[in-house]
Amino acid sequence: MGTSGKCVDGNMNGNGEGDPIQSSNCTNSRTQRWSFGTDATLRVQNMCMRPASEPPSPGTLLQARACDQGPYQNWLYRSDSSLINAASGLCLTDPGALTSGPSQLSLASCTGGANQRWTFT
């Protein structure tokens, strides 16, 4: 899963719980193999993507957390390729999409920009 030629990376330096979710160069590592679950979660290595704080506001960073079916772990994939956090209405955003290095993903108001369009491979 990625945007602007970069891949979403769960990082997972520790056990995964609370690790930041970032975009980085695509390496096909297991921490970049995200799936969209039938329960509307974004998953990697048995962890789910969710905001670092609740309720989130624009600029809230994203983390990997244990999947608990909480409302802030649910996402909507729209026809314009944006991913919306169902509980907040904010879009998954890569603020560093145009940079070459990694950047931590966050939530932002939906603008339809290239840094909010996601593809699954």
Q: What are these model-predicted stretches?
A:
Residues 1-121:
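Lectin-like carbohydrate-binding module/patch detector with strong preference for beta-trefoil
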